[in-house]
């Protein structure tokens, strides 16, 4: 049933010390989604029931080390002015990134630059300036490099888009990429999955494969908010389901990622053309790929960790379970980018083959392959380029596809026999290598076989998925990057209606930083070492973040 008009002044969270009350601010909703009628997809899938084989789950035991160690949460100091404290911290960590008046810089460059956020209708001529209306914005409360709009010269926009989107399969030096994909997937399954996976679990998966069904769709839809459901139904007029997988919309990405080094702040922004899918085209596939993702993570042996659906606590528990390996072996980060937008035919083949190993109905893959991008034309940049089998933005298998490509490329480049332990999420990973492992050829293999430009970062402070691995006694904690948390607070142009959701996400991030009393001080030493700043006040920044996480009004005042 559904219960309305229930408001709580506070709730209790079992992970807080001594079950202290956690104050929650509940904003009244302007419009409550109350539709109890089945939508077009429920009607369309109504005759398709959930008949596939159940997912085999591994029994996961809590870390013996962590279960015996009582946690004492960090008690933060009161910071009268969190905004000023965080601004000072950011300026100390990345000097020069936030001190410039951004709108004045944009004014100086306006004559020779093109505002890529404006649609141009007409002929773009070489060596001619294009006048475009530009709305100057005021500085954010906390000035960081996370500015959502930017001016970029047309030539740089063209080159950035071409570099990101152009990757013909023959670059990967394979005459038969399908056979190469089959070889890589077979090798990965034998190395990364639980022993005898093909002879036991895989047989039941393939016997009763996962296909379209109304049960998984309703389960997925229940996790969406009212605004998303309303938008989804609006795309299906008169309850008609019509998939246009070959259709796409193009736009130039507005938010330019911040530059994390002093030298890089003077580089030109790197925009890209976003080729996106509509909500109703992804809806029937998302619920299926969620189940495949669960099977993928359950099939991995304990030494190979996918953090795609893992919380900070889950990652911390896994790190603690393998503390003996982490302490004994050397680690490397493989820093590679452009997984989803530049990888195409080989990546799509590998994910398709691996999904079939996990029990995806081949008929689903045959339908979904129409969603991949072929020829793209951008009205914004006056471009047309070909990118065979590129993944669209918003594709339902984006995270799973990235993790699959991440695992397989790292395994093949480094060698499965050299890897003692590995964790991956998106395009981030850390590998702990066995003694005597030689990874000198890894960079060349990544480039020639997988079209990835990588950097090997050995024996440094471990940084993974915007977080640090922090040792505290006999426990390893995965702690979000304080600098990244501050950076996101300075983002300008966010929808004010999302402020409550941003506060909840922000509070969860801060709770991971303060889950143990020793974390802020150890994290301070780690960040000082990685950033090369001996007097960076990380503890003071944590105190300021904790003050904001404890009070919604303070959070709202800083980010508004």
Language-model segments: which ranges?
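Viral RNA-dependent RNA polymerase
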Residues: 1-560
């Amino acid at each position: 049933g559904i219960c309305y008009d229930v408001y709580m002044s506070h709730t209790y969270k079992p992970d807080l010390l001594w079950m202290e009350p956690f104050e929650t601010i509940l904003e009244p909703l302007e419009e409550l989604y109350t539709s109890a009628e089945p939508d077009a997809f429920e009607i369309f899938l109504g005759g398709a029931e959930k008949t596939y084989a159940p997912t085999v789950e591994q029994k996961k035991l809590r870390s013996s080390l962590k279960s015996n160690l009582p946690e004492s949460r960090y008690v933060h100091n009161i910071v009268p002015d969190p905004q000023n404290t965080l601004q000072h911290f950011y300026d100390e960590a990345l000097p020069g990134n936030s001190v410039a008046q951004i709108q004045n810089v944009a004014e100086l460059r306006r004559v020779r630059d093109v505002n890529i956020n404006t649609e141009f209708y007409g002929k773009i001529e070489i060596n001619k300036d294009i006048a475009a209306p530009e709305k100057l914005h005021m500085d954010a409360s906390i000035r960081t490099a996370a500015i959502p709009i930017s001016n970029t010269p047309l030539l740089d926009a063209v080159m950035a888009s071409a570099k990101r989107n152009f990757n013909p399969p023959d670059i990967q030096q394979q005459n038969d990429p399908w056979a190469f994909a089959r070889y890589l997937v077979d090798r990965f399954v034998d190395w990364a999955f639980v022993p005898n996976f093909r002879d036991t679990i895989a047989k039941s998966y393939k016997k009763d494969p996962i296909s379209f069904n109304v049960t998984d769709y309703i389960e997925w839809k229940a996790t969406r908010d009212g605004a998303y459901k309303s938008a989804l139904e609006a795309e299906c007029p008169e309850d008609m389901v019509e998939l246009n997988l070959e259709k796409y919309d193009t736009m130039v990405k507005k938010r330019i990622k911040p530059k994390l080094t002093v030298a890089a702040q003077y580089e030109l922004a790197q925009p890209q053309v976003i080729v996106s899918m509509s909500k109703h085209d992804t809806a029937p596939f998302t619920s299926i790929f969620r189940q495949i993702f669960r099977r993928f993570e359950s099939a991995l042996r304990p030494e190979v960790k996918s953090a795609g659906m893992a919380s900070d606590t889950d990652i911390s528990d896994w790190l603690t379970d393998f503390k003996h390996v982490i302490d004994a072996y050397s680690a490397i980060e493989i820093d590679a980018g452009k997984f989803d937008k530049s990888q195409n035919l080989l990546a799509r083949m590998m994910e398709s083959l691996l999904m079939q190993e996990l029990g995806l109905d081949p008929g689903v893959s045959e339908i979904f392959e129409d969603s991949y991008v072929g020829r793209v034309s951008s009205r914004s940049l006056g471009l047309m380029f070909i990118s065979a089998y590129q993944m669209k933005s918003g594709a339902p298998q984006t995270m799973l596809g990235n993790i699959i490509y991440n695992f397989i490329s790292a395994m093949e480049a480094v060698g499965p026999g050299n890897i003692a332990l590995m964790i991956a999420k998106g395009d981030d990973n850390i590998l702990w290598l066995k003694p005597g492992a030689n990874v000198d050829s890894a960079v060349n293999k990544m480039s020639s076989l997988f079209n990835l430009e990588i950097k090997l970062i050995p024996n440094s402070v471990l940084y993974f998925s915007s977080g640090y691995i922090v040792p505290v006694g006999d426990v390893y904690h995965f702690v979000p990057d304080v600098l990244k948390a501050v950076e996101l607070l300075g983002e300008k142009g966010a929808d004010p209606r999302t402020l409550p959701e941003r506060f909840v996400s922000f509070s969860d991030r801060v709770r991971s930083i303060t889950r143990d009393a020793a974390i802020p001080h150890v994290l301070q030493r780690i960040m000082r070492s990685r950033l090369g700043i001996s007097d960076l006040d990380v503890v003071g920044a944590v105190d300021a973040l904790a003050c904001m996480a404890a009070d919604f009004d303070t959070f709202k005042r800083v980010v508004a």
